[in-house]
């Protein structure tokens, strides 16, 4: 007689084993109809599996986060059901849930097209309208092997081989189609309604390019029609803002096959990069960082000593010279310790903050590369703070202020903060872990910040705080981080002399605000839709001549504006002024200055903003004053 305890503390007694669906039915028909699965003693369970002992039960519906994930996972199985009905010689690989959706990797000699996506989507719609029950079969490993051998599902058999002999395997039966999964899944397809298949892409079995080539079908699913429509609108907007398209359209950068994952910056894009670097450099200087520069290639012996050779060898580019092997640095920290190690350091010298715009290379898989967001060569706004244990909290607190100042400058006001604490496998004493975690916690709490704890997610060498931005499309980008490191200063012999004249290892704080320049610029391109604020824009103002008579004045003003430190260009083509204004607007230039006969007579320009607003007539001194005010605000309106 299982006693079921519900979230409100109430208890229900049942005479025999009971399913989550039956528990829901005992509460009300409406809840039973909405039930997707349950959480039993903190373990997710299918709605139709019997519970035969006293348990704490939470009923899951589509309103719950777990509910929508279960819906999405069930839709992945529906892809399998549909494609197996439509196409022959199809083998199913894996179909997991991802953020906002799901995908299924499929092996087929037939190459799917966008027209096939429509066909598959129509078949899925047909299947879900039949409202069939999804049966769960809990079988032994031997029975699972037999099932998938009969169906010639090669990839499922490979997965089963990795499963231990003991225990049962969950098979899910969608009419004639059978798939395997940990589950849970919806009990009936009436819970599956609001979905869209999105796109096709290529993939490899287990993500290894040496394995079979697969085809991936992506989809999204939501609990309500409005949520689906809102998401598809966001997807459409994201495609409009795609930094790769805008980068090409506005001649910011390009990537080519001869140098995958490495950026060819064009003058417009490089201007943005340089302005961003200058801004960060000023911020660092104001906060007492010392800028350094370290080599690109370093003998592998240093990477062996630091531990990177053992852990990251496959991700490192190497070269050889005179019988020595060098690694192109994938990160800057070991090199920064070499700078710290030059000369004796006293506790009175700490903290020492070493910063570098460090160019790094990592051998990312070609399939993972994505414009500016995932590259092989990137520049970090990297810094390492060498300090005592007692200084950790103050340094972290100051860094948090710095992060918020920079993000606010770019218009990011919603920052998500996560604190990751000690993992099971770690170095360092419990005492120093206690002190470090307490220091990070206090630094956050003293500022009354909301943050999320991630127990056990810290690195083996110390806890960390991660800072993520939420952009205009509600996408989250993890950028900033500050990481406590007890290990590397010891491995690389970094020491200082303490107050008792004893040598001690400093604590090292790894920290970055942007993460990498490439990725952050990619985020900015999409955030601004390439309509950069005036301080960051490749060109801040464009001068347009109305007639050929005004060309000389345009050129003279352009020279004066550039000589005063602004970024200006001209359009003196023999085109109608309306056409020129439209072109300048499409080119995303923040200020558009028109010079005709009337303006030339009074040595001024007719100024308009990118949004079309007429700003009035300005002579050069007043124009410079306006531009200085706009640049000083850095696009902020407060």
UniProtKB/Swiss-Prot annotation:
Catalytic activity from the UniProt record: tRNA(Thr) + L-threonine + ATP = L-threonyl-tRNA(Thr) + AMP + diphosphate + H(+)
One Gene Ontology MF term: threonine-tRNA ligase activity
Keywords: Aminoacyl-tRNA synthetase, ATP-binding, Cytoplasm, Ligase, Metal-binding, Nucleotide-binding, Protein biosynthesis, RNA-binding, tRNA-binding, Zinc
Enzyme Commission number(s): 6.1.1.3
Enzyme class: ligase
Function: Catalyzes the attachment of threonine to tRNA(Thr) in a two-step reaction: L-threonine is first activated by ATP to form Thr-AMP and then transferred to the acceptor end of tRNA(Thr). Also edits incorrectly charged L-seryl-tRNA(Thr).
Xref: NCBIfam families: thrS
Subunit structure, interactors included: Homodimer.
Name of the protein described by the UniProt record: Threonine--tRNA ligase
Protein's organism: Prochlorococcus marinus (strain MIT 9301)
């Amino acid at each position: 007689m299982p006693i079921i305890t519900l979230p409100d503390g109430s208890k229900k007694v049942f005479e025999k084993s009971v399913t989550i669906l039956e528990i829901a039915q005992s509460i009300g028909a409406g809840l039973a109809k909405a039930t997707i699965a349950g959480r039993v003693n903190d373990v997710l369970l299918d709605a139709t599996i019997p519970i035969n002992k006293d348990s704490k039960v939470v009923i899951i519906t589509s309103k719950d986060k777990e509910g929508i994930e279960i819906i999405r996972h069930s839709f992945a199985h529906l892809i399998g059901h549909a494609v197996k009905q439509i196409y022959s010689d199809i083998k199913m690989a894996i179909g997991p849930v991802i953020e906002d959706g799901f995908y299924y990797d499929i092996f087929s000699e037939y190459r799917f097209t966008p027209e096939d996506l429509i066909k598959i989507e129509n078949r899925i719609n047909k299947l879900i309208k039949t409202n069939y029950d999804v049966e769960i079969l809990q079988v032994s490993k031997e029975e699972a092997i037999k099932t998938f051998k009969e169906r010639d599902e090669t990839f499922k058999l490979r997965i089963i081989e990795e499963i231990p002999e003991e225990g049962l395997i969950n098979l899910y039966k969608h009419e004639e189609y059978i798939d395997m999964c940990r589950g849970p899944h919806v009990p009936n397809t009436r819970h599956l309604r609001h979905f869209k298949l999105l796109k096709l892409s290529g993939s490899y079995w287990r993500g290894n390019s040496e394995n079979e080539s697969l085809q991936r079908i992506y989809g999204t699913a939501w609990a309500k029609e409005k949520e689906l429509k809102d998401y598809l609108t966001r997807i459409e907007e994201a495609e409009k803002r795609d930094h790769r398209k805008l980068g090409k359209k506005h001649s910011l950068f390009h990537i080519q096959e001869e140098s995958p994952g490495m950026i060819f910056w064009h003058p417009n894009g490089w201007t943005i990069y340089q302005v961003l670097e200058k801004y960060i450099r000023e911020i660092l200087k104001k906060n007492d960082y010392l800028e350094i520069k370290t080599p690109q290639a370093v003998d592998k012996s240093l990477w062996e000593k630091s531990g990177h050779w053992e852990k990251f060898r496959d991700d490192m580019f190497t070269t050889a010279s005179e019988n020595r092997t060098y690694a192109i640095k994938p990160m800057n920290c070991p090199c920064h310790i070499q700078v710290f190690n030059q000369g004796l350091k006293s506790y009175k010298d700490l903290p020492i903050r070493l910063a570098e715009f460090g160019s790094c290379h990592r051998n990312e898989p070609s399939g993972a590369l994505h414009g500016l967001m995932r590259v092989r060569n990137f520049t970090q706004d990297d810094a390492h703070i060498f300090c005592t244990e007692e200084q950790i909290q103050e340094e972290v607190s100051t860094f948090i202020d710095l992060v918020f100042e920079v993000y606010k400058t770019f218009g990011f006001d919603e920052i998500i903060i996560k604190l990751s604490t000690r993992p099971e496998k770690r170095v360092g004493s419990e005492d120093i872990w206690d002190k470090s975690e307490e220091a990070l916690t206090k630094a956050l709490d003293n500022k009354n910040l909301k943050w999320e704890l991630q127990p056990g997610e810290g690195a083996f060498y110390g806890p960390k705080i991660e800072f993520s931005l939420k952009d205009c499309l509600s996408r989250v980008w993890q950028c900033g981080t500050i990481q406590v490191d007890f290990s590397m200063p010891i491995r690389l012999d970094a020491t200082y002399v303490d107050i008792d004249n004893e040598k001690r290892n400093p604590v090292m704080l790894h920290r970055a605000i942007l993460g990498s320049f490439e990725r952050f610029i990619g985020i900015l391109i999409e955030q601004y839709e390439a309509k950069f604020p005036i301080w960051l824009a490749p060109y801040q103002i464009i001068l347009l001549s109305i007639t050929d008579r005004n060309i000389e004045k345009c050129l003279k003003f352009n020279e004066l504006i550039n000589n005063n430190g602004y970024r200006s260009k001209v359009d003196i083509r023999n085109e109608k002024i309306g056409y020129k204004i439209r072109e300048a607007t499409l080119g995303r230039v923040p200020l558009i200055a028109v010079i005709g006969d009337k303006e030339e007579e009074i040595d001024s320009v007719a100024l308009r903003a990118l949004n079309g607003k007429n700003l009035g007539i300005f002579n050069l001194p007043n124009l410079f004053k306006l531009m200085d005010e706009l640049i000083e605000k850095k696009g902020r309106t407060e």
